[in-house]
Amino acid sequence: TACVIEVNSETDFVAKNETFTSFVEAVNAAALASDLQGGKDGEDIEALLAVPFEGATVKDALVEKTATIGEKLSIRRFEKVAGDVAVSYIHGGGRIGVIVAANGASDDAAREALTNIAMQVAAMNPTYISRNDISAEELAKLQEITVDAALNDPASLPKPILNKLIDKAMNSSAWSDED
């Protein structure tokens, strides 16, 4: 099982502060140890804020750290994944976090493969995992944007090239369909 949490501060200066980063790591550990699954809606965050933490709750600690650091801190979202092997990848000094899990293998090769996938996801920042996850409305919107851009091109692209551009636009929104 792995967990990733987004705790926001008002400035990058605070986000690089050892007190802040230690706090985020500790809250992440508390979230991981809890029965919560994660999310970004109000109920999930409220449940996380109620989790026991260092003799109080996560909410109490958040208020205390806000006072200590002198900047408003907030928990925006968190996610947990479970599998035979789970890895996390943090990039950009904590600005990007990815967690990936898989079942069926738990050896070093599986861990390395998942780490590589997590790094790729962090680099691509896909909106979807697969084209199958893209709603019909979003697909239509992507097609419309691509067609409009192509039609405004003075070269007036032939239909086969236009279709390839549409495919490329959709693939760039989904991680597993990348070439």
Residue ranges of model-derived segments:
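N-terminal assembly/interaction segments in proteins that build large macromolecular machines
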Residues: 1-179
